[in-house]
Amino acid sequence: MNLHEYQAKQLFARYGLPAPVGYACTTPREAEEAASKIGAGPWVVKCQVHAGGRGKAGGVKVVKSKEEIRAFAENWLGKRLVTYQTDANGQPVNQILVEAATDIDKELYLGAVVDRSSRRVVFMASTEGGVEIEKVAEETPHLIHKVALDPLTGPMPYQGRELAFKLGLEGKLVQQFTKIFMGLATIFLERDLALIEINPLVITKQGDLICLDGKLGADGNALFRQPDLREMRDQSQEDPREAQAAQWELNYVALDGNIGCMVNGAGLAMGTMDIVKLHGGEPANFLDVGGGATKERVTEAFKIILSDDNVKAVLVNIFGGIVRCDLIADGIIGAVEEVGVNVPVVVRLEGNNAELGAKKLADSGLNIIAAKSLTDAAQQVVAAVEGK
């Protein structure tokens, strides 16, 4: 779950990290009033969306008058911002962040992720701030400096100083950087984050460090113990199908193809998408119904898949372990009858009571194609899409 920039900076303030004074606004009038609260300009106005590349798309602007602030807010509020990180529809702009402009002397980068290879939280710092860190890692990886946090000791001040020295910082900037490093690490660990990023972390012309931007990604599996973060969730920034799936504890990710996929188990779901592509098809989604594939969840899964107008056929791939395939077949039949599926449905059942499940599907009288194997299922669903 991602947070907006203004929400990230609210967290920074709670942990004593330096950031520009700013206010999130939902109307042009609020934006003008925010400028008055901040004081004399210039100001910076920023569209609040869960995507990078806002500046290049016109979603960030330095302004010198309240009239410019109002014009920016009127232009963007209620509209959609399209960046290189969004799809063609963009993300809705419901808030504008108005904050004091900062005199920038130099831009740095500081961020952290969970590194699965080392199984630790790893901090990354670079002198190449203001640029996508992925681009820096690809083109100039030697400019990224890393430290890993020991899970027993947590972050240590010497690690912050080590990164500061590698960035060429001196004097009070080393102390300021170390404080920011320790604060970010504390936020990361206490708030169960998967990602934290300040890009850019700037050195002002007055010789101080300021968190000019903030990006936070929370671990969705830990939100049950982070109620304040859970309340910050902005579902308008999420794919509505993904949000609906989450309510039913379905793992759904929208893709660009035309073959809907419903599978139990994440690994099997990825394998299913691979074999669909191997036979010339394009998956429309990743959908893992999990071990409790009840009729209700299967019905909801069908509704979510078919809400995508691009879907021309559905492939259901179920491995019956604890779950019996005949019960899954009952759920599929009931779901198809209730939802009114008007596209071909190919079902592959394997495992516990698979033969009985296949017989129920065959006897249902519905437009359900029972596949004999995963390869057969992939071939049949691709053929169905092609009208063969």
From Swiss-Prot:
Keywords: ATP-binding, Ligase, Magnesium, Metal-binding, Nucleotide-binding, Tricarboxylic acid cycle
Binding site for Mg(2+): N199, D213
Pfam families according to UniProt: ATP-grasp_2, Ligase_CoA
Recorded metabolic or biological pathway in which this protein acts: Carbohydrate metabolism; tricarboxylic acid cycle; succinate from succinyl-CoA (ligase route): step 1/1
Gene Ontology CC terms, in alphabetical order: cytosol; succinate-CoA ligase complex
Catalytic reaction list: succinate + ATP + CoA = succinyl-CoA + ADP + phosphate; GTP + succinate + CoA = succinyl-CoA + GDP + phosphate
The keyword Ribonucleoprotein is annotated on this UniProt entry: no
Residues that coordinate or bind substrate: N264, G321, I322, V323
Keyword Metal-binding part of the UniProt annotation: yes
One GO term of the biological process aspect: succinyl-CoA metabolic process
Note accompanying the cofactor annotation: Binds 1 Mg(2+) ion per subunit.
Positions bound to ATP: K46, G53, R54, G55, E99, T102, E107
Family statement drawn from the similarity comment of this UniProt entry: Belongs to the succinate/malate CoA ligase beta subunit family.
Assembly and oligomerization: Heterotetramer of two alpha and two beta subunits.
PANTHER family tied to this protein: SUCCINATE--COA LIGASE [GDP-FORMING] SUBUNIT BETA, MITOCHONDRIAL, SUCCINYL-COA SYNTHETASE BETA CHAIN
Protein name: Succinate--CoA ligase [ADP-forming] subunit beta
Organism: Salmonella dublin (strain CT_02021853)
Gene: sucC
